[in-house]
Amino acid sequence: MKILLIGYGAMNQRVARLAEEKGHEIVGVIENTPKATTPYQQYQHIADVKGADVAIDFSNPNLLFPLLDEDFHLPLVVATTGEKEKLLNKLDELSQNMPVFFSANMSYGVHALTKILAAAVPLLDDFDIELTEAHHNKKVDAPSGTLEKLYDVIVSLKENVTPVYDRHELNEKRQPQDIGIHSIRGGTIVGEHEVLFAGTDETIQITHRAQSKDIFANGAIQAAERLVNKPNGFYTFDNL
């Protein structure tokens, strides 16, 4: 499989290493600013890249959105987070002409977490719910795209939910419909997501801890391996 990388930060550097270990080939990289240290051919436009079987994106909205407006037809794996609604609308449009895969978190374990959460929410309807995520001190967006995904699962199953991001400004007791959303940034934490169900005299915690960023890179590669043989359409872990 010949792979075009969109972005060449820490994540796509891992994708490159792991993909080559699996026998795949990196045919090019698209970056905001070309760098002399990038060990692959660098491009500015997707259409300029010849022979790629799939593109894997771990970048940012500033790089990705202009590329998505170009005229190209290439299976596309997208892991960029930020401006989610705009991104999903654009990917849905592109999926009419090419296979597109999107996940805010490329870990299959996190996908499993969403399924566990979907089963737990109806069973624990009277429990308060708090969501917490922790990441390294270089992550710029908060809350994480993964936490937003977990919140979306809850919203799909509960009515009149209210997200609460900053409780210290509230001088009132917690309301039953509140969903607390908390972000922690520090050190080199790869990624931790916890769902707390707090009831009367008991609590239940569901936690996913990433121990290496390789799980996200491998998840993207595995998605790409499946996507290249798919018909046009929008794919997630649910239908890939």
UniProtKB/Swiss-Prot annotation:
It comes from the Bacteria. GO terms for cellular component: cytosol. NAD(+) binds at residues 79-81, 103-106. SUPFAM superfamilies: Glyceraldehyde-3-phosphate dehydrogenase-like, C-terminal domain, NAD(P)-binding Rossmann-fold domains. It is an enzyme of class 1 (oxidoreductase). Its EC number is 1.17.1.8. The active site is at residues 135, 139. InterPro entries: DapB_C, DapB_N, DapB_N_CS, DHDPR_bac, NAD(P)-bd_dom_sf. GO terms for molecular function: 4-hydroxy-tetrahydrodipicolinate reductase; identical protein binding; NAD binding; NADP binding; oxidoreductase activity, acting on CH or CH2 groups, NAD or NADP as acceptor. (S)-2,3,4,5-tetrahydrodipicolinate binds at residues 136, 145-146. Belongs to the DapB family. This is 4-hydroxy-tetrahydrodipicolinate reductase. It comes from Staphylococcus aureus (strain COL).
